[in-house]
From Swiss-Prot:
Keywords on record: Cobalamin biosynthesis, Methyltransferase, S-adenosyl-L-methionine, Transferase
GO MF term list: cobalt-precorrin-5B C1-methyltransferase activity
Catalytic activity field: Co-precorrin-5B + S-adenosyl-L-methionine = Co-precorrin-6A + S-adenosyl-L-homocysteine
Gene designation per UniProt: cbiD
Protein name listed in UniProt: Cobalt-precorrin-5B C(1)-methyltransferase
Pfam families (alphabetical): CbiD
Disulfide bond positions: none
């Protein structure tokens, strides 16, 4: 059995310990993660998937009634059914966090309002959706804080609904009434997002991190002969290409708790932000930049990255660090 989200092939002994066929089905569909003792942890849905469901529901409700869930295609390529509530021209989706107890956006309601149009599709973001307070390498001041993957997911959901209803065009507005309040519990303001939450999600799923699952990840890493730890799905994809003979494991922000358990050679591979802030938490101090992504546009970045490599390697000589950009090119290698 393979996890369709991460690509991890579950060991037979783990599968044999999971005797509930319903739970096995959830795992095979990517809706849950199987742990080393045979129990499962359910994945939740990202803000991007939740907003997509609300948007699709709002468009469908222009011509349809009597439905309480919609089908959306996640960025991971997995189609899921997400519960919604509707009124004519309005769709709402309450964000489901799965078995991730630390999800501060759990339960947040996304609302979408759809208005028929003569042609084309218009998408706008309103109250509770954060906006960038300054220019960044990928966004301009005032742009909604919606990642590229989430934006594509939302637009695809709207287009599916337009095709299903047969209407010539539509205008959709997405908002989250409690978004500004919830955003106060996040790091948005530190990275330059104000007025609400970010709409994110590289896979469409929220990983069910807890102490139990962390131990399972440790078990996987300890038993692997050659291991690459990644910080996210993009890093995972490129790590598989760069290191095809290694076991690639999604560690997320748990690098610091997993690496001490490993005694052999280890590779950390991922995008700059999480990797560099893990190996050198103070890399941005004195730079005048708030994010690693912004720092990357400055001539001081590459020397700072090399210095960070040297400092970390002096304490962890068995760990190699490989930093890639969003196109998969290696921009830094401690080897």
């Amino acid at each position: 059995m393979q996890d369709p989200v991460s690509g991890f092939i579950y060991p037979e002994e783990w599968i044999s310990l999971c005797t509930d066929e319903t739970e096995r089905l959830l795992v095979s569909q990517g809706l849950a993660v199987l742990t080393s003792d045979g129990t499962i942890r359910r994945r939740g849905f990202t803000t991007g998937s939740s907003a997509s469901a609300a948007a699709k529901a709002s468009v469908l409700s222009l011509t349809k009634t009597g439905f309480d869930e919609v089908s959306i295609l996640t960025p991971a390529g997995i189609r899921v059914q997400i519960p919604v509530t509707i009124a004519r021209g309005t769709g709402e989706c309450r964000k489901y966090s799965g078995d991730y107890p630390g999800d501060v956006t759990a339960g947040l309601v996304f609302t979408a309002e759809a208005t028929p149009a003569d042609s084309g599709t218009t998408l706008v973001f309103g109250e509770g959706i954060g906006r960038w307070s300054r220019d960044t390498p990928r966004y301009k001041t005032g742009d909604p804080a919606v990642s590229c993957q989430a934006m594509d997911e939302i637009k695809n959901a709207i287009e599916e609904a337009v095709q299903e209803t047969g209407i010539p065009g539509v205008s959709v507005r997405i908002f989250a009434r409690e978004g500004r309040i919830v955003a106060e519990k996040t790091l948005n303001q530190m990275v330059g997002v104000v007025g609400g939450i970010s709409v994110l999600g590289t896979t469409g799923f929220v990983e069910p991190w807890d102490d139990h699952l962390e131990q399972t990840v440790c078990d996987r890493a300890v038993h692997a002969e050659r291991v690459v730890l990644t910080t996210g799905r993009i890093g995972m994809r490129y790590a598989r290409m760069l290191f095809p003979d290694h076991e690639v494991i999604l560690a997320g922000s748990r690098l610091g708790t997993i690496i001490p358990h490993l005694t052999g050679e280890v590779i950390i591979c991922g995008l700059p932000a999480l990797v560099l802030k893990y190996i050198n938490p103070v890399i941005l101090e004195g730079t005048g930049f708030s994010t690693v992504e912004e720092f990357m546009t400055n001539d001081r970045f590459l020397p700072a990255m090399q210095t960070s490599f040297q400092i970390y390697k002096s304490a962890h000589p068995n760990v190699r660090i490989v930093v890639v950009n969003r196109e998969g090119a290696i921009i830094g290698d401690s080897q």
